[in-house]
Curated annotation (Swiss-Prot):
Residues recorded with modification Phosphothreonine: T58
Family membership: Belongs to the EXO84 family.
Subunit structure: Component of the exocyst complex composed of SEC3, SEC5, SEC6, SEC8, SEC10, SEC15, EXO70 and EXO84. Also interacts with SNP1.
Region of interest (Disordered), ranges: 1-69, 101-136, 467-498
Gene symbol of the encoding locus: EXO84
Residue stretches of biased makeup (Low complexity): 103-114
PTM-bearing positions, type Phosphoserine: S139, S482
Crosslinked residue numbers (Glycyl lysine isopeptide (Lys-Gly) (interchain with G-Cter in ubiquitin)): K219
InterPro entries assigned to the protein according to its UniProt record, in alphabetical order: Cullin_repeat-like_dom_sf, Exo84, Exo84_C, Exo84_C_1, Exo84_C_2, PH-like_dom_sf
Name the record gives this protein: Exocyst complex component EXO84
Bias (Polar residues) ranges: 115-136, 467-476
Record's GO cellular component terms: cellular bud neck; cellular bud tip; exocyst; incipient cellular bud site; mating projection tip; prospore membrane; transport vesicle
Record field: compositional bias (Basic residues): 7-18
Gene source species: Saccharomyces cerevisiae (strain ATCC 204508 / S288c)
Length: 753
């Protein structure tokens, strides 16, 4: 209110000063029409005596109401639900003895300007202090839990902390609110019923500060709890990993113990057998005490029953090798690109503390580690990114590496590779260098032995394969049973060659060759092509199983699938794998012949049209459409012959000839329809075979009638009409044999009546 009055007085004073200091306006004569108005005397115009300038100007009711409304708004900020009471602003304010300003702060000798300066200095210090206090409250240290907000701290500086007044001290207010017997309604009625606006403002501010402090404490407690939970969670994860590692180690230990137990049991069994055998030999010696000499007891290796080897130790050794390779893959970056975990591959030696030298100057280049495998040499150098890991520098097959020791130094080895590159390495220990050289020599000797065994096995396989190729005959075009080539050829003909070699012996040789190919020792990795060939060779047995169960469709599909894969592999196969490819191709040809032979028998003996169509379609899938059509037509010819034989006696010639015409020509018509259904894509190429067969069947019909006329029997016009009717029915499928009937009538016109 004081500030508002001072502002208004200052504006009035400026207006008076401006009017007094403008001489131009005083020169203007006054208007005669309007009377001269008296200007109000400004109480602040004469400020010579500061003691008389303390009197405040009066404020009207409207401005006083505006000031009161502003004060209500300031008080309503602290409490949103605050409703200001209806007050009479004409009444004087009550006395406030608690708010007496100390005498130290009042100086009657100060003038108006010094009073304003002092207020400005106090207001300028206030925000900085509150800023420092609020910054200190926002720190997240553990010691800041009990700190109060800035406003409470500022208020506590005015009121001592030892005071128990809840209106001025937030600590006492907090204790009061924490009391379980605290009643808010009673407190408001007793303490705040007759309180002043300033007291209510202080109490509201204390409540707000206390609420902020509690919220900050809650946030800090939540943050602390979250950090503790995360710490416990991390510890649990570490413990879980350790438990998994311990569990894996326990499982490995159990496996090793089980294997050791099995090995011990087998060794005890073998030892018992050896002891029993020795005891039996000792009894035999005692029974033959009259013999001139005593025979030594049989050893374990001399008994055929004891020649069985215990391979459990080999399995343990292979697992140990795999573990070493896995460790190599973890420690050496890029090792998996050059080394595969193939069965039998293992590490012979791992030598560290080697230094690669310049072959020309002999200066050291980098630290390396050399790994000698049973068929590879891997050299790894230190990785620049990681201090403890290695990265692959060179990797070559052992047979392509030549290692020599320098004459003037026992610690240096010169490695010469197949690509005409060479590297010089030096070791700190001369014994380590000699041991590495011995391991390489032994590994190369083992590779030479394996290579010789492979050469002998390959030579034997080539000779056997060459023998099979010379004795094996592939079905050719002459086996096609087309009516144009051989109409009455026996369907049970054999395709065995002229030499005295049976199919059983060929099969026996093929089995031995396959076993020899798969049992070959391999010094290098089995390529993907070789693995596919082995898989295809196993698929040949599936054909035999399906064929034995008379599942011709599955057998044909498997055969065609293997043939397509062999054709794909033949383009990128090596010379070493070409022999196995030819061997599998030879076995596939045998299975093809077996399938075609059994399909031929099935087609000829089938009386159901469904099985007949299925067998014919399978023959077409095998690439034998002409042979399939020939078998199909021969089956239909046999079917016509069987139906004719079932007619019986020929007491009524007219009825007999009518039945002959119906059987033959209706079967021909049905056969043409089945041909169009089975041979959809190949009908245009082999339709001539069908037309020839139909023509032959029509000729056979008239030949059979001629045999009936040999007994001087006469033909009735009814039988001729029935034959003409059936022949005309063939026109529906595109066949017209009316001219054959006309020729028959002309030839036997004298016997028709």
């Amino acid at each position: 209110m004081v500030e508002f009055s001072l502002k208004k007085a200052r504006n009035n004073w400026k207006h008076v000063k401006k009017s007094a200091s403008s001489p131009a306006k005083q020169k203007t004569p006054p208007s005669p029409a309007k009377p001269k108005q008296k200007t109000k005397k400004n109480p602040y115009s004469d400020l010579k005596d500061p003691a008389t300038s303390y009197t405040l100007p009066t404020i009207n009711a409207r401005e006083r109401s505006r000031v009161a409304t502003s004060m209500q708004r300031r008080l309503s900020i602290h409490n949103t639900n605050y409703a200001p009471p209806t007050l009479d602003y004409s009444m004087p304010l009550p006395d406030m003895p608690n708010m007496i300003v100390p005498n130290d702060n009042v100086d009657s000798s100060h003038n108006n300007s010094s009073f304003t300066t002092e207020n400005e200095s106090v207001s300028s210090k206030g925000p900085s202090n509150s800023l420092n206090l609020s910054t200190a409250d926002l720190s997240l240290n553990d010691s800041s839990y009990n700190k109060v907000p800035a406003r409470s701290a500022m208020r506590n500086t005015v009121n001592p902390s030892g005071s128990n007044d809840p209106f001025n001290n937030s600590t006492s207010l907090r204790k009061m609110l924490a009391n379980p017997h605290f009643n808010a309604k009673d407190f408001v009625h007793d303490k705040l019923g007759n309180a002043s606006a300033i007291t209510i403002d202080k109490f509201t501010s204390n409540l707000t500060d206390l609420s902020i402090q509690v919220q900050e404490e809650v946030k800090l407690n939540i943050n602390k709890s979250y950090n503790e939970i995360m710490t416990v969670n991390n510890d649990l994860n570490v413990a879980m990993l350790e438990l998994k590692r311990v569990r894996a180690n326990i499982n490995d230990l159990n496996e090793v113990l089980d294997q050791c137990t099995k090995i011990a049991e087998k060794r005890l069994q073998l030892q018992d057998q050896i002891d029993q055998e020795r005891q039996g030999n000792f009894n035999n010696v005692e029974s033959h005490s009259n013999s001139p000499a005593l025979l030594p007891p049989l050893k374990a290796g001399q008994n055929g029953n004891l020649m069985r080897r215990d391979r459990s130790s080999v399995l343990i050794l292979e697992k140990f090798w795999d573990t070493e390779l896995d460790q190599l893959f973890k420690n050496v970056e890029g090792a998996q690109k050059f080394i595969n975990s193939t069965k039998g591959r293992h590490i012979l030696m791992n030598s560290a503390n080697w230094m690669e030298l310049n072959t020309t100057t002999g200066k050291p280049l980098q630290m390396v580690q050399i790994f000698i495998l049973n068929d590879l040499v891997l050299i790894a150098d230190k990785s620049r990114d990681k201090q403890n890991d290695f990265i692959v520098s060179q990797c070559y097959p052992l047979k392509d590496v030549t290692v020599t020791q320098e004459e003037f130094s026992t610690k240096r080895l010169l490695f010469k590779f197949s690509n005409s590159n060479s590297s010089l390495y030096e070791c700190r220990d001369a014994d380590e260098c000699s041991r590495l050289l011995d391991v390489i020599r032994k590994a190369k000797d083992d590779l030479c032995d394996i290579f010789h065994v492979e050469e002998e096995n390959s030579k034997r396989i080539r000779e056997s394969f060459r023998y099979l190729q010379s004795t094996q005959q592939t079905p050719g075009r002459e086996n096609n049973r087309s009516p144009n080539k051989n109409k009455r050829r026996s369907m049970g003909g054999s395709i065995t060659p002229g030499r005295n070699v049976t199919g059983a012996m060929d099969q026996y040789l093929l089995q031995n060759l396959t076993l020899s190919m798969h049992s070959r020792p391999r010094s290098r990795d089995m390529s993907s092509t070789a693995q596919r060939l082995k898989f295809l060779d196993e698929g040949v047995e599936e054909i035999d199983i399906e064929l034995a169960r008379l599942r011709f469709e599955s057998a044909v599909e498997t055969l065609l699938d293997i043939e397509s894969q062999l054709e794909d592999l033949s383009e990128r196969i090596s010379d070493e794998e070409l022999m196995l490819l030819n061997l599998i191709s030879l076995k596939i040809e045998q299975r093809r012949e077996a399938i075609s032979s059994k399909l031929s028998q099935s087609i000829l003996s089938s009386n159901e049209i469904v099985h007949l169509k299925s067998g014919t379609e399978n023959m077409i899938k095998l690439g034998l459409p002409e042979q399939a059509l020939d078998l199909f037509l021969q089956n239909r010819s046999n079917f016509i012959q069987d139906l004719i034989l079932q007619i019986g006696s020929v007491d009524n010639p007219t009825n007999y000839l009518t039945q002959l015409a119906v059987i033959r020509f209706q079967t021909i018509k049905k056969t043409v329809e089945d041909f169009q259904d089975i041979f959809k894509e190949l009908g245009a190429k082999i339709s001539s075979i069908l037309v020839d067969w139909c023509s032959d069947e029509v000729d056979n019909h008239f030949k059979l009638i001629d045999k009936q006329l040999l007994n001087d029997e006469m033909l009735s016009p009814g039988s001729i009409k029935s034959s003409r009717k059936q022949i005309d029915g063939l026109k529906a499928v595109g066949l017209d044999f009316v001219y054959k009937l006309d020729e028959f009538i002309k030839k036997n016109s004298d016997k028709i009546r």
